[in-house]
Amino acid sequence: MSTPVSAEQQAREQDLVERVLRSFDATADPRLKQVMQALTRHLHAFLREVRLTEAEWETGIGFLTDAGHVTNERRQEFILLSDVLGASMQTIAMNNEAHGDATEATVFGPFFVEGSPRIESGGDIAGGAAGEPCWVEGTVTDTDGNPVPDARIEVWEADDDGFYDVQYDDDRTAARAHLLSGPDGGYAFWAITPTPYPIPHDGPVGRMLAATGRSPMRASHLHFMVTAPGRRTLVTHIFVEGDELLDRDSVFGVKDSLVKSFERQPAGAPTPGGREIDGPWSRVRFDIVLAPA
């Protein structure tokens, strides 16, 4: 139980808060001023609520320093931190209000890479990545049901070992690509049936999860980013119906509307385009509805 704080001490602490707030009074950008003063108020409120010790302050500074050291062109520890604290999903929720039947957005994640290879409709994004084949198909429409042709559909995912291509030490490009929707808004491609995997947990964010008894596991998912002129950019996933991690995804990214049925197909079942597959495979339909910009 914390020791009561005297009125005199509270006044000294509040005086400091007011002085820091006034230091931003001359900020020319009104939005920057609003953000910095709000950040100051909430940060000091947190410090005073928990009565942070100097040792804990040093630990926090060390944590942020470690997050900076581990961040590079292949790994973004600060995005992971934002994700596991729910800040990413909260920001997405605030900036992507529901618009009719538009597909819901979810977290971007730290593993998107610009310049993915293009495939034609019916192509394969796997690029040699290990995993059970999965046929993905659907349409891209607007909220009035009209097809959206030539929408750019970026897709990426982890392989069967739970790693994205950028987590390997070589320069491979695998399990990521982009394609365009057809004149009728249709699209289709081969991918890998998603499986659960842990977010990188060998750094400071992983240590925080371990210290708080939280799992680093993500529910099975496939990433999408869909762009088209005059439409709101959509960043989303589809999740696998029946996955036991749906209710405890480590980054709070699951939304009911994004949980889809991945229908298992036995070995020897006819495949779209006549592709030869030795073992079982799956198929899923994901119809995408884009909100206006």
From Swiss-Prot:
It catalyses: benzene-1,2,4-triol + O2 = maleylacetate + 2 H(+). Optimum pH is 7.5. It is an enzyme of class 1 (oxidoreductase). GO terms for biological process: beta-ketoadipate pathway; catechol-containing compound metabolic process. The keyword Ribonucleoprotein does not apply. Optimum temperature is 50-55 degrees Celsius. Pathway: Aromatic compound metabolism; beta-ketoadipate pathway; 3-oxoadipate from 3,4-dihydroxybenzoate: step 2/4. Belongs to the intradiol ring-cleavage dioxygenase family. Catalyzes the ortho-cleavage of the aromatic ring of hydroxyquinol. This is Hydroxyquinol 1,2-dioxygenase. It comes from Nocardioides simplex.
